[in-house]
Amino acid sequence: MIPLQHGLLLAAILFVLGLTGLVIRRNLLFMLISLEIMINASALAFVVAGSYWGQSDGQVMYILAITLAAAEASIGLALLLQLYRRRQTLNIDTVSEMRG
């Protein structure tokens, strides 16, 4: 069994890597991938904590987080596809220029 500190440290490292990718990257697809990494890191923390205390609540929260991540990914990819068809780019700087 993995110690609680090691599992939570791994989850924290993954979360920080996802947050760094979200802040640094300018491509919307990579930003969506970074967001998925952050969601999976938080789900990993739930599983590690549930395993440590012998509760199945962590696994239930993991299933909920994966369901949320799948819904977010499908909606995000559909929006990115439409955006790419209209603007021919996924660069956040180009997309943020609004007409009005």
Swiss-Prot record:
Residues that span the membrane, as ranges: 4-24, 28-48, 60-80
Gene Ontology terms, MF aspect: NADH:ubiquinone reductase (non-electrogenic) activity; quinone binding
Major location category of this protein: membrane
Pfam families (UniProt xref): Oxidored_q2 (PF00420)
GO biological process entries: ATP synthesis coupled electron transport
Membrane association type: Multi-pass membrane protein
GO CC annotations on file: NADH dehydrogenase complex; plasma membrane
Domain of life: Bacteria
Top-level enzyme category: translocase
Location in or out of the cell: Cell inner membrane
EC number(s) reported in the record: 7.1.1.-
Record keywords, A-Z: Cell inner membrane, Cell membrane, Membrane, NAD, Quinone, Translocase, Transmembrane, Transmembrane helix, Transport, Ubiquinone
Reactions catalysed: a quinone + NADH + 5 H(+)(in) = a quinol + NAD(+) + 4 H(+)(out)
Quaternary structure and partners: NDH-1 is composed of 13 different subunits. Subunits NuoA, H, J, K, L, M, N constitute the membrane sector of the complex.
Protein's job: NDH-1 shuttles electrons from NADH, via FMN and iron-sulfur (Fe-S) centers, to quinones in the respiratory chain. The immediate electron acceptor for the enzyme in this species is believed to be ubiquinone. Couples the redox reaction to proton translocation (for every two electrons transferred, four hydrogen ions are translocated across the cytoplasmic membrane), and thus conserves the redox energy in a proton gradient.
Family: Belongs to the complex I subunit 4L family.
Protein name, per record: NADH-quinone oxidoreductase subunit K
Annotated source species: Musicola paradisiaca (strain Ech703)
Gene that produces this protein: nuoK
